[in-house]
């Protein structure tokens, strides 16, 4: 199988931020809304839900290897991860629609990616009791990663300078809305919907093997310890960064000269970006926005 050629994918200009059902979005994630809203999930679908830049690609790749690594190894060299794990709401000129990719995915189960906040997830996922793997990342590193992503990705709104972006992040004026509502929304959902595994990026960095084992247990997979070890090695940052199928280098709308998709993969990189004043302001806003939640993030590991 040939690697798909997306060199014709071009964006004339960066998209504007729009208000969509109370959430900041761009048309690239809302233009296909009727089909997204009415998407028919299946009971064995696995929805990988994240706020952008929280570790989506990492978990997507782990899931793909767990289910299909041995069964169809050719997938690993012929299909970029974003084709194997469709991005449900994606609607870019020159790329297949996320809903179409998902509908035509030949695999079972179907791993499907979304950044939608919990209230916008198509209701069929809940009705079908599909499994949901949510990955959350601490707000400060998430903001830094998102800033660099917006700089290099012509499919995202212009981020401005770091200070401008950080103010927008604290106000929730990013694509897919406020980080705070996103992480809290899925955390709350977990209290009434038991088929969610809530994972943390920091835990994955600390001990990837342990988190792969947690995933297997949630998914009901009896993957051997040797196999899990092999997968754990294959999904390390440096390995994924070199792998064309997982590093997004096949998408022409991203300018790696500005910043690579696989940028640093670290916990605590925010310290290289936040000034003391920005950090104090951020902590104040964080305390306010997170005062009614029990979800706890670790920033020191
Ligand atoms: N294997 C591994 N180990 C550690 N970190 C990893 C790994 N794979 C991806 N990443 C880091 O995750 C960030 C990208 O997040 P997403 O995949 O969620 O991006 S996206 O929302 O799908 O565009 C981005 O974070 P930053 O490096 O901090 O920018 C990636 O480098």
UniProtKB/Swiss-Prot annotation:
**Principal subcellular localisation of the protein:** cytoplasm
Give the regulation of activity.
Inhibited by Co(2+), Zn(2+), Cd(2+) and Pb(2+) ions. Inactivated by Hg(2+) and Cu(2+) ions.
> What tissue specificity does the UniProt entry give?
Expressed in liver.
Intracellular or extracellular location(s): Cytoplasm
Task: Fetch the Pfam families from UniProt.
Answer: Sulfotransfer_1
Q: Where is 3'-phosphoadenylyl sulfate annotated to bind?
A: 53-58, 137, 145, 201, 235-240, 263-265
Q: Which InterPro entries match?
A: P-loop_NTPase, Sulfotransferase_dom
Q: Which UniProt keywords apply?
A: Catecholamine metabolism, Cytoplasm, Lipid metabolism, Steroid metabolism, Transferase
MF annotations from Gene Ontology: aryl sulfotransferase activity; estrone sulfotransferase activity; sulfotransferase activity
Q: Which domain of life is it from?
A: Eukaryota
Q: How does activity depend on temperature?
A: Active from 20 to 43 degrees Celsius.
Q: Which GO terms describe its cellular component?
A: cytoplasm
Q: What is its EC number?
A: 2.8.2.-
* Gene3D superfamilies, per database record: P-loop containing nucleotide triphosphate hydrolases
Similarity comment text for this entry: Belongs to the sulfotransferase 1 family.
Task of the protein = Sulfotransferase that utilizes 3'-phospho-5'-adenylyl sulfate (PAPS) as sulfonate donor to catalyze the sulfate conjugation of a variety of xenobiotic and endogenous compounds, including 2-naphthol, hydroxychlorobiphenyls, T3 (triiodo-L-thyronine), T4 (thyroxine), estrone and DOPA.
* Protein name as catalogued: Cytosolic sulfotransferase 2
**What organism does the UniProt record list as the source?**
Danio rerio (Zebrafish)
The gene it comes from is: sult1st2
